[in-house]
């Protein structure tokens, strides 16, 4: 799926990730996307686009409990494919993706490590605890103890009542619009399951399936939608940027991975967790926390 897009400024390769904090396929893809970022290293510019899976203008469900049960079953089916943890019970469906997306976008101003941890905590609120952080109060609780996070600055930037015209909201609004202008290659795309990634039909047209990655480089653009392997992502990156450096051989050290990310799932640890990891058990498999993360994680606090 090669286009004629101009090569980006800066690094020769740009990777654009369309995602949402509460998308189960995006949650399950995190191990592969982390591996992709490690493989590309500093040779790529990464940009995350928040697609707003649950929009704020949607009508509330007439039976919230039934909706939560139905969506929980969907999460269970996705988890069976991805190997990602899932909650024993989804207590509610997120009322909107906007508050969490605003928080995740605002966190980017505090650096990539903080931004990654914020998005991870938001995902864990839904896919481990079963209580999606979809309000400012729930977001604040989910982010308690994130190392390096200036929670007050995040609240001012993303969660204030008067944020409708703030730069962060304008950015996420652009993200939403970009997600709803998919490239023609994915409109009408059909393929083998479980998630081939064809653009989703919506009332206003189409939006990208989540996750979808765009790779832009000197040789054009490729779009890689849906549930994909690291090899497929790397092949697309090399197709548009043939001079990418070789990917280092060997698996990353599990202890170093846990130290860096503080939270890992079973697909990232094929040989098991390193010593000292703290397991949070779920019906979809364990989430492994570093001792430092376990000491502050809301997942281990009393309900």
Predicted regions, residues:
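Local sequence-structure signature of Cys/Sec-based thiol-disulfide redox active-site neighborhoods
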Residues: 7-35, 49-51
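A generic structural signal for short coil/turn motifs at secondary-structure boundaries
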Residues: 24, 56-59, 222-224
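C-terminal cap of thioredoxin/glutaredoxin-like
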Residues: 17, 30-36, 124-303
């Amino acid at each position: 799926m090669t286009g004629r897009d101009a090569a980006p400024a800066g690094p020769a390769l740009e990777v654009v990730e369309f995602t949402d904090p509460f998308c189960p396929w995006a949650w399950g893809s995190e191990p592969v996307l982390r591996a992709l970022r490690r493989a590309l290293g500093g040779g790529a510019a990464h940009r995350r686009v928040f697609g707003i899976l649950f929009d704020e203008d949607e009508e509330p469900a007439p039976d919230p409990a039934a909706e939560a049960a139905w969506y929980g079953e969907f999460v269970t089916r996705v988890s069976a494919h991805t190997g990602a943890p899932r909650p024993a019970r989804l207590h509610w469906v997120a009322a909107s993706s906007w508050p969490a997306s605003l928080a995740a976008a605002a966190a980017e101003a505090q650096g990539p490590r903080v931004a990654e941890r914020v998005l991870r905590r938001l995902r864990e609120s839904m896919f481990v605890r079963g209580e999606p952080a979809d309000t400012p109060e729930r977001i604040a609780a989910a982010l308690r103890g994130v190392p390096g996070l200036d929670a007050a600055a995040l609240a001012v930037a993303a969660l204030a009542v008067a944020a409708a015209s703030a730069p962060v909201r304008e950015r996420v609004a652009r993200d939403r619009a970009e997600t709803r202008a998919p490239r023609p290659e994915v409109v009408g795309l059909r393929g083998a399951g479980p998630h081939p990634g064809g653009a989703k039909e919506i009332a206003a047209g189409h939006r990208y399936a989540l996750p979808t990655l765009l790779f832009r480089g000197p040789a054009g653009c490729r779009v890689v939608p849906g549930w994909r392997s690291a090899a497929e992502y790397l092949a697309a990156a090399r197709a548009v940027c043939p001079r990418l450096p070789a990917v280092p051989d060997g698996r990353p050290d599990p202890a170093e991975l846990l130290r860096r990310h503080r939270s890992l799932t079973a697909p990232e640890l094929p040989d098991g967790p390193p010593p000292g990891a703290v397991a949070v058990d779920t019906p979809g498999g364990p989430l492994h926390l570093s001792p430092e993360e376990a000491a502050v994680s809301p997942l281990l606090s009393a309900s």
